[in-house]
Amino acid sequence: RDRVASRGLGDLYKRQIQQLEERKKIDLERKKKRDDRGSKKFAKDIKLTTDIIFITKEREVPAVLSNLDPILNDEGFYGIQLGVEDNLTTGRFLGHDYKVKMIQVSLKEDLEEEFKKLIKSGYTYFVADLNSGELSKLSNLKESKNILLINIRSKEDSLRNEFCKTNLIHVAPSYTMLSDALTQYLVKKKWKKWFLVIGPEKEDKAYADALKKSAKKFNIKIKEERVWDFASDLRRTAQKEIPIFTKGVNYDIMVVADEKGEFGEYLSYRTWDPRLIVGSQGLKPTNWHRTHEQWGATQMQNRFRRKSGRWMTPVDYSAWVAVRVIGEAVSRVQDNKLQSIKEYLFSEGFGIGAYKGVKVSFRNWNGQLRQPILLAAPRSMVSVSPQEGYLHPTSELDTLGVDEPESSCIF
């Protein structure tokens, strides 16, 4: 019976793969026909070509806890491609074309020198899959004065505040936006007593700082704050160490800051008291998730899966938004000059649909994209913030993250 069941599952998996390949083939044929029609009709009418650089840095592969999640070396790539396709849908009718060049700087190469070469070659628009330190260095280069960097990965709050730059805008949400989104939901559920567990990494501390600010902002009590500093292999010791680590605290919910996933997954079902896990594990605030299906998101999920063969990640989504932002601005102002594009991006008239029920737009005081934040469990969508009842004189989306009066950014 086991062999029959196993064979049945194998056949089902093969059929699913076959169906996926067939749909992908149909999509490619349809795209080729559209491209052929478009090139025949509009090739002679191209009046404006916008060049975009997608720049990323090769990373050393980190140690993983399991092999369940694949290590991706193409994050952002397929999001960029979908963004270009969507831009061309309107662009061809307007005589606009978009070309993207993918640049991955190797471990041995100097990122700053490679970036300077690209600027010298005449490129203006850069979609950047880089960390906070790299973004800060590139935006501070004297050669970077007349370019636009679009951040699709880093959540670091300082890049939106004291270290903000007029040549750097952010599609990726900040730590404060994510923590505010989560906190609003926890307040709604009346889970107001937190046990905060913080990892040892720099990113963990940055996320924890944002969580503490959100707790203060929404009148949450952090009953206990502990740093996870165990070096043992949790696959063998979790059942012994975690109950002792979490014992003796009166709390409603455990909030975890473990950005690299070094220990957070082991906390569930092992705490001394039966409590839910939220934060970087468990119920997680994010700008995109594979379970998101509302507001036409299913269409985007299916398009991405057929193109890439995998689920869309937050970085993939941010890459798509970044390219769409440029395309929308070029279409509206009928120009691709930097000054014209930036003026429109920060104007009240700018906004694009992004499969989240409302148009997303940029905050003109720090260059951050205001957007709804999804609250997702590993296999289900739970809620979307801002939560009902949180009001703002300009936009309810500005209840998430640093508002203009609080901002230390000076553009």
Residue ranges of predicted features:
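Extracytosolic ligand-binding ectodomains
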Residues: 11-411
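Short, small-residue-biased leader/transition segments that mark boundaries at the very start
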Residues: 2-13
